[in-house]
Amino acid sequence: MAVGKNKRLTKGGKKGAKKKVVDPFSKKDWYDVKAPAMFNIRNIGKTLVTRTQGTKIASDGLKGRVFEVSLADLQNDEVAFRKFKLITEDVQGKNCLTNFHGMDLTRDKMCSMVKKWQTMIEAHVDVKTTDGYLLRLFCVGFTKKRNNQIRKTSYAQHQQVRQIRKKMMEIMTREVQTNDLKEVVNKLIPDSIGKDIEKACQSIYPLHDVFVRKVKMLKKPKFELGKLMELHGEGGSSGKAAGDETGAKVERADGYEPPVQESV
């Protein structure tokens, strides 16, 4: 037998000895995720990230994270078939400030709308907002029976489908091109674009279940902290403790003007 140390025994002690288990969560911190001021409920949840160690900074690990939230959770509403994607753009204290990143309908809603004996009409268009965001909007609509119609089917002719698709693209382009991202999101929350399309297409063929089913973010302008702060209002910029920050609508009469103050 060769004279020398048995490396295996001296190095690790007992063969197959267990390593000391370190809880990975002890090195992590919780951050609050804040939605922009367009939504009623601002505090949408928490996210984990490893603490800053050397050159690895925690805030860099948070930037670019995408959160998918139901509109029901953002608006404290019952209608829950719209999902909004929010992306973290900046970190202030323990708050992740997010911006709109996309929208989608839930799978069960889409499946419930597709039925027999009707025509499904889809359209998509790439549009740039006034503040430089390039969005791709997808729209869907379905034909319905006319009043007093006896026939079971309600299929649109190819020419009518083309006219409706053209109308969809025109309305989506018009609604997005003339507004900034904040105003576009405010239109997507109640889906006023879908309702406008439904009204405009009644003369061609009656439609129902018209929705902007998806919005994709294709290009963004250069990040500006000032614009993000505007989206979040004062609540996003201050490092307040987490809590349910909810906004409430103030009802005012038409033509309301605030009273003039004598002294400031």
UniProtKB/Swiss-Prot annotation:
Protein name: Small ribosomal subunit protein eS1
Cysteine disulfide links: none
Disordered: region residues: 233-264
Biased composition (Basic and acidic residues): 242-255
Sequence positions bearing Phosphoserine: 237, 263
Family per similarity comment: Belongs to the eukaryotic ribosomal protein eS1 family.
Covalent link (Glycyl lysine isopeptide (Lys-Gly) (interchain with G-Cter in SUMO2)) residue numbers: 34, 249
GO BP terms in the entry: cell differentiation; cytoplasmic translation; negative regulation of apoptotic process; ribosomal small subunit biogenesis; translation
GO molecular function, one term: structural constituent of ribosome
Cited PANTHER family: 40S RIBOSOMAL PROTEIN S3A
